Amino acid sequence: MISAYEQLVAEGYLNSQKGSGFYVAVELPEQYLPEPSSVQRDSSPKAHFDINRAFAPGVPDLDAFPMAQWQKLLTRHMSRTCLLGNQDIQGSWTLRCALADYLASSRSVNCSPERIIITSGAQQALSIATMVVLKQGDKVLMEQPGYAQMRKLIQFQNYQFEPLFVREKLGFDVEAVTSSDADALYITPSNQYPMGTTLNTEQRGKIINWAVEQSSWIIEDDYDSEFQFAHRPYTSLQGLAAQMGRDDRVLYVGSFSKVMFNGLRLGYLVVPERLVEQCLVVKDALSGDSPTHTQEALADFITEGGLLRHIRKMRRLYKTKHEQMHLSIQQYFGDRVCVVSQAAGLHITLKWQDGMDEQRFTKMAEHEGSSCDL
């Protein structure tokens, strides 16, 4: 009841007098809220589309996340008034220190906290990276098929797109890179999306040498690198480049969307020291700083061992799910489909052997409440 009166006061229909009560306003508002038209009332969607439904691409097992522990960490920092104001646009120092240690131990990334920029997910990191090292008209060599959002970014920024065709099981031909005059190469070397191939150490070395000799840039998206089921993951390309003394042309991108949950919207960009200030200028123009309470909670989640424990648990869970999915595909589809991706990550890539209409199959999957990408 009180809320209703307060709303009428806010809209100008009533006046409030302390100790006396509410009175009808002498001067009523000049405009009244219009009555919703019949079109507006009937325009609600007929069916709710759950973007996190079964087999939705890129969505981790949200039910398996330790939400109680995460809520405890958030609560720990919500009462810190020092976090309520403007913050360092580069990101929380505590988080960058924790992240530098984590990346060094888990992915052999060579970086200091000063070279890490916290972003609103991997997509913002990719936007910053390309805007700093490229100009309109520059040529970007990119895996095909590949990450659709990166393809959109290339088109939006008016870069030239040069496809780097990925073969089943084999990956792309490294000679296609070393013979290219592209200004930048975007790759997912640890688990190519969506074909699931991996670059070995020799191939990575050739690509690093090409970038240095051609004064080109490598943008390494370490997509799904935490979830390898068939073999131990290779170290990051950036880490190998540092061992070779040639990491000055590599920008490293990652996020926590797959290892934690998509709604976190925290990613990171590791760049050569000489690019840090330029990246911060671009980030400031795009969005400013990232939510600080969440960053501080994530820093604690990393340093207190919560992230590693969660990753180990999810690696076992996803391996079991991957094996079961593979068996189910064989059981229900037999020789009609071929699995072309490796045992890694949160997706399985299929190839139809009998000319199945992908559009028809997608509609059938949607009818059953599932999702698949074409």
Indicate where each model-derived feature is located.
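Conserved core of the PLP fold type I
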Residues: H77, T81-S215, I219, S225-F227, ...
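Conserved PLP cofactor-binding pocket of PLP-dependent enzymes
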Residues: F227, E366-L374
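Short beta-strand "wing" residues that participate in macromolecule-binding interfaces
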Residues: N15-S16, C111, C372-D373
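N-terminal basic, amphipathic alpha-helical segments
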Residues: I2-T75, L84, L280, D284-P291, ...
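General small-molecule cofactor/ligand-binding pocket signal
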Residues: I117, E162-L164, L251, V340, ...
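Conserved core segment of the aminotransferase class I/II
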Residues: W70, G245-R246, L251-R316
